[in-house]
């Protein structure tokens, strides 16, 4: 897992002037927000909101010179699909990519649809989820991953997905960070009754519409 340290005093200035800091936040599994004892609560809340827009799933841990909760740094690796006790829904955390947006009407239909873009704050980072109820062929999946890797490269900061593949009883699990993708893993069975394909994305300097166009390939095959 990845830990990123964010200075509560200088965070806004750092984010505004250093794109690399935004990237590091987007890739993090946990954020240590330091010097919270030296910052106003309103400033801390503002920073936390900005962090959540950049990376909805990352846990934010407040710390100060008197308190660094070391126990929070244990168990950072939440990607372990071969472990029988691994919770794929908690790992995907798709609800966190939707909770800070305006509620959109949800329609029960059988084609791909968008599940909210929660980033509109000028950091050039977009975090969103996409869902389709159609099954996907392995050929389509491999092509989709290759397309994302070759066309997006380092601009695809993170991708996680639970996918319904034709001819398979359990879902496929995909996980990519920039142009590097883990091998596709398979679960023996679905964790619940929802067998839709669900993916969450964090991108930089890439319009969501481009990913949506790639995603439509899945719905057509």
Language model features by range: what are they?
Residues 3-5, 32, 202:
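Structural motif
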């Amino acid at each position: 897992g990845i830990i990123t340290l964010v200075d509560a005093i200088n965070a806004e200035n750092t984010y505004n002037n250093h794109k690399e800091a935004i990237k590091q936040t987007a890739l993090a599994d946990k954020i240590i927000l330091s010097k919270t004892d030296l910052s106003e609560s309103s400033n801390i809340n503002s920073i936390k909101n900005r962090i959540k827009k950049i990376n909805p799933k990352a846990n934010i841990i407040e710390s100060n010179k008197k308190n660094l909760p070391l126990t929070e740094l244990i168990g950072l690796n939440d990607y372990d699909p071969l472990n029988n006790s691994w919770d794929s829904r908690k790992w995907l955390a798709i609800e966190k990519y939707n909770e800070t947006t305006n509620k959109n009407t949800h329609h029960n239909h059988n084609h791909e649809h968008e599940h909210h873009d929660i980033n509109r704050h000028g950091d050039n980072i977009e975090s969103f989820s996409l869902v389709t109820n159609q099954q996907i062929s392995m050929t389509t999946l491999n092509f989709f991953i290759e397309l994302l890797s070759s066309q997006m490269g380092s601009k695809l900061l993170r991708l996680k997905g639970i996918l319904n593949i034709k001819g398979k009883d359990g879902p496929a699990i995909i996980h990519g960070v920039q142009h590097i993708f883990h091998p596709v893993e398979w679960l023996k069975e679905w964790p619940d009754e929802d067998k839709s394909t669900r993916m969450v994305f964090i991108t930089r300097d890439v319009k969501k519409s481009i990913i949506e166009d790639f995603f439509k390939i899945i719905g057509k095959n």
